[in-house]
From Swiss-Prot:
Top-rank lineage group of the source organism: Bacteria
Subcellular location: Cell membrane
Pfam families in the cross-refs: DUF423
Swiss-Prot/TrEMBL keywords: Cell membrane, Membrane, Transmembrane, Transmembrane helix
GO cellular component: plasma membrane
Membrane spanning stretches: 3-23, 46-66, 69-89, 98-118
Topology with respect to the bilayer: Multi-pass membrane protein
Main location: membrane
Similarity remark: Belongs to the UPF0382 family.
Record protein name field: UPF0382 membrane protein SAB0533
Native source organism of the sequence: Staphylococcus aureus (strain bovine RF122 / ET3-1)
Length: 122
């Protein structure tokens, strides 16, 4: 599905941008702890952006579970990385409670991809 390729490319691109912003724009302006949180958000966004690219490539040849995997991983990026970015910029700690929702969405997305693989392989 072209949409997942676009979403994957956009997320990978944004991860490069947020990584550069963290390294050059935030360093020295926030604590090392928050800089580490920012880096984790960037890393997970990149990994899962690449996953969306792969899902986009294979989604036309497999089951609906691949599409579910893509949407769950995309939502995971928003909840996980998005909440961490906002947490770092605002330092509103309650936003950290949203982050695990993104982690769970990532995990379910990966499980759906595994299920799709078994269904496709027969």
């Amino acid at each position: 599905m072209k949409l997942f390729i676009i979403l994957g490319a956009l997320n990978a691109m944004m991860a490069v941008g947020t990584g550069a912003f963290g390294a050059h724009g935030l360093q020295g302006k926030i604590s090392d702890h928050y800089l580490s949180v920012w880096e984790k958000a960037t890393t997970y966004q990149m990994y899962h952006g690449l996953a969306l690219l792969i899902i986009g490539v294979i989604s036309g040849t497999t089951s609906i579970n691949v599409n579910w995997a893509g949407w769950l991983i995309f939502a995971g990026i928003i909840f996980f990385s998005g909440s961490l970015y906002i947490l770092v910029l605002t330092q509103i700690k309650v936003l950290g409670t949203i982050t695990p929702i993104g982690g769970v969405l990532f995990i379910i997305g990966w499980i759906m991809l595994i299920i799709a693989t078994f269904k496709f392989a027969g």
